[in-house]
């Protein structure tokens, strides 16, 4: 008799996605981050759901409701800190996942890659709106500064900003709509994840060598289910260590002060995972130029498949490209550091150099390195 998982209409989908899926035999731990992102999304949805049961999206009570969750709700502090630090884990996994895609040439699966970029934008938007909800000083001023950037758009900018605010400043209407969007977006993200996986399963997974692995496949279960389970354990361990020992390590102390429109914090900065983009934004003196650079810092990922001129897919056997890739990683760390520093000498100059280097590596140096490596292949 045929196994039920192979004939049942619903179980058949699960079977083809998680059990009998043919997977390359040589994929490394860098391929764990997809499933870890799925775990992060589930953690965020469940903790967020329980937080939403006690949160009020009103400017007068939002801050107090978060305090109430931490003090009075049973294990509320735990749920709140898992949610806050879960976002950090989410972004660590996201950046690792994207980095893996760039290093091993996974961007040649263009549909999967483009849905991935869309997912990245959606997660960033969700995280930004979530940061506004506690209604602390950094929540309020972060919302004011970032939404204000849209005023740089010619002709419609000012109207657009007021339309998003729902008034003439960040106020109750803004908070309410941000809460509504923050609640609905993770479910849209979950739907996009399904599309992401649908496109991925059309082609099958890439592997570290970048060579087609059709002749060497193994079933997903038990090999990669146990491997993913180990990843889940390690991620959960790190998340719980962060939550239980130093839950405020990655947060901003200013956000423990209730929002006050009359008092600007000395250094307005976003959460650590946006600092690299914030540094690129600040390194351009022109407002519209800064906004374009900010958007392009992420959107540049969409150009990578078209800039791929190497005869090899993966960087595994391309030492010049490898050196450039790790320079890019170091550059992103530099930008993250600069984004958290005040706007003064020498940080301004370092930020500008790092921003130019970021775009130069992706748009100019990597294609050049590929050309050189192609020439070396002929020798």
From Swiss-Prot:
Q: Which SUPFAM superfamilies match?
A: a domain/subunit of cytochrome bc1 complex (Ubiquinol-cytochrome c reductase), Transmembrane di-heme cytochromes
Q: Where are the transmembrane segments?
A: 33-53, 77-98, 113-133, 178-198, 226-246, 288-308, 320-340, 347-367
Which cofactor names does the annotation list? heme b
Q: Please tell me whether the keyword Metal-binding is annotated for this protein.
A: yes
Subcellular location per UniProt equals: Mitochondrion inner membrane
InterPro entries linked to this entry: Cyt_b/b6_C, Cyt_b/b6_C_sf, Cyt_b/b6_N, Cytb/b6-like_sf, Cytochrome_b, Cytochrome_b_C_euk/bac, Cytochrome_b_N_euk/bac, Di-haem_cyt_TM
* Biological process according to GO: mitochondrial electron transport, ubiquinol to cytochrome c
Listed binding positions for a ubiquinone are 201
> Which annotated residues bind heme b b562?
83, 182
Q: Where does heme b b566 bind?
A: 97, 196
Q: Which GO terms describe its cellular component?
A: mitochondrial inner membrane; respiratory chain complex III
Q: Which PROSITE patterns match?
A: CYTB_CTER (PS51003), CYTB_NTER (PS51002)
Q: What Pfam families does the entry give?
A: Cytochrom_B_C, Cytochrome_B
User: Keywords assigned by UniProt?
Assistant: Electron transport, Heme, Iron, Membrane, Metal-binding, Mitochondrion, Mitochondrion inner membrane, Respiratory chain, Transmembrane, Transmembrane helix, Transport, Ubiquinone
- GO molecular function annotation: metal ion binding; ubiquinol-cytochrome-c reductase activity
Cofactor binding notes:
Binds 2 heme b groups non-covalently.
Please report the record's description of how this protein sits within the membrane: Multi-pass membrane protein
The record ties this protein, via Gene3D superfamilies, to: Cytochrome Bc1 Complex, Chain C
The subunit field of the Swiss-Prot or TrEMBL record says: The cytochrome bc1 complex contains 11 subunits: 3 respiratory subunits (MT-CYB, CYC1 and UQCRFS1), 2 core proteins (UQCRC1 and UQCRC2) and 6 low-molecular weight proteins (UQCRH/QCR6, UQCRB/QCR7, UQCRQ/QCR8, UQCR10/QCR9, UQCR11/QCR10 and a cleavage product of UQCRFS1). This cytochrome bc1 complex then forms a dimer.
Say which family it is in: Belongs to the cytochrome b family.
Q: Tell me the function of this protein.
A: Component of the ubiquinol-cytochrome c reductase complex (complex III or cytochrome b-c1 complex) that is part of the mitochondrial respiratory chain. The b-c1 complex mediates electron transfer from ubiquinol to cytochrome c. Contributes to the generation of a proton gradient across the mitochondrial membrane that is then used for ATP synthesis.
**PANTHER family given for it?**
CYTOCHROME B
Remaining remarks:
Heme 1 (or BL or b562) is low-potential and absorbs at about 562 nm, and heme 2 (or BH or b566) is high-potential and absorbs at about 566 nm.
Official protein name in the record = Cytochrome b
Give the originating organism. Romerolagus diazi
Q: Which gene encodes it?
A: MT-CYB
């Amino acid at each position: 008799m045929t196994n039920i998982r192979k004939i049942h209409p619903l179980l058949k989908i699960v079977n083809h996605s998680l059990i009998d899926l043919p997977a390359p035999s040589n994929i490394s731990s860098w391929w764990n981050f997809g499933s870890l992102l799925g775990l992060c999304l589930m953690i965020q949805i469940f903790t967020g759901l329980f937080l939403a049961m006690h949160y009020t999206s009103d400017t007068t009570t939002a801050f107090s409701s978060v305090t109430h969750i931490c003090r009075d709700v049973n294990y509320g502090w735990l749920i709140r800190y898992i949610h806050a630090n879960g976002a950090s884990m989410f972004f660590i996994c996201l950046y690792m996942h994207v980095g893996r895609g760039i290093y091993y040439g996974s961007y040649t699966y263009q549909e999967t890659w483009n849905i991935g970029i869309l997912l990245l934008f959606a997660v960033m938007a969700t995280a930004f709106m979530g940061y506004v909800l506690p209604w602390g000083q950094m929540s309020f001023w972060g919302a004011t500064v970032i939404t204000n950037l849209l005023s740089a758009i010619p002709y419609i900018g000012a109207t657009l900003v007021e339309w998003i605010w729902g008034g003439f400043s960040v106020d109750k209407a803004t908070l309410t709509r941000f809460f509504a969007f923050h609640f609905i977006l993770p479910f849209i993200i979950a739907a996009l994840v399904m599309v992401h996986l649908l496109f991925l399963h059309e082609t099958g997974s890439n592997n570290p060598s970048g060579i087609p692995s059709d002749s060497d496949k193994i079933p997903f279960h038990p090999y990669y289910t146990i491997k993913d389970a180990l990843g889940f354990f390690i991620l959960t361990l790190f998340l719980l260590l962060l939550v239980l020992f130093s839950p405020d390590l990655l947060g901003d102390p200013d956000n423990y002060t209730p929002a006050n429109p009359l008092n600007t914090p000395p250094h307005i900065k976003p959460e650590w995972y946006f600092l690299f983009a914030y540094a690129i934004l600040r390194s351009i003196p022109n407002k519209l130029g800064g906004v374009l650079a900010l958007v392009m810092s992420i959107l540049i990922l969409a150009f990578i498949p078209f800039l791929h001129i190497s005869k090899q897919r993966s960087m595994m056997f391309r030492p010049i490209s490898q050196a450039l890739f790790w320079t890019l990683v170091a550059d992103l760390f530099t930008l993250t550091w600069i984004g958290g520093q005040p706007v003064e000498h020498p940080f301004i100059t370092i930020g500008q150099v790092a921003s130019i280097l970021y775009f130069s590596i992706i748009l100019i140096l990597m294609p050049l390195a590929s050309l050189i490596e192609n020439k070396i292949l002929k020798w």
